Amino acid sequence: MGKIFRPSSRESTILSKIESSKEHMRRMAISKVRDCSEPLANGIATKLVETNLVETTSKNSLQEQILKCLDKLSRLDDFEVDYQVAPFRNLVPQPQIVSLYVTAYVIEKLINHKDVVDIFGSDEDIYLTINQQVKKYMPL
């Protein structure tokens, strides 16, 4: 039989601080999206097309859709964001929330857009490509 974990007040405060710092980083990342949404959308769209992960008839249309996604992210509440990223939460060990949300958008919504021919690569490949651009434009 396993040992029952009963945290002391010190352990509880440490766990609470860790959890609140994660939430703070999440809120900071979402708020930074407003400041750099246009160059970020351009960077993500360009990289997705260059790496042949997304085949599209119009790169500008892809960029506009990602820009709309980023603008929507900055206005959503926590529940809606969590609901959108839930299927992809275990994609990588410590996902960046903006990258995860855009990945979910590309995989679930963008596939049905009229200008997108097809989406290639694994979910992880798409996440890593998007995360590379998010880190470039939004260093935390």
Please identify what each model-predicted range represents.
Residues 2-140:
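Internal, charge-rich low-complexity segments
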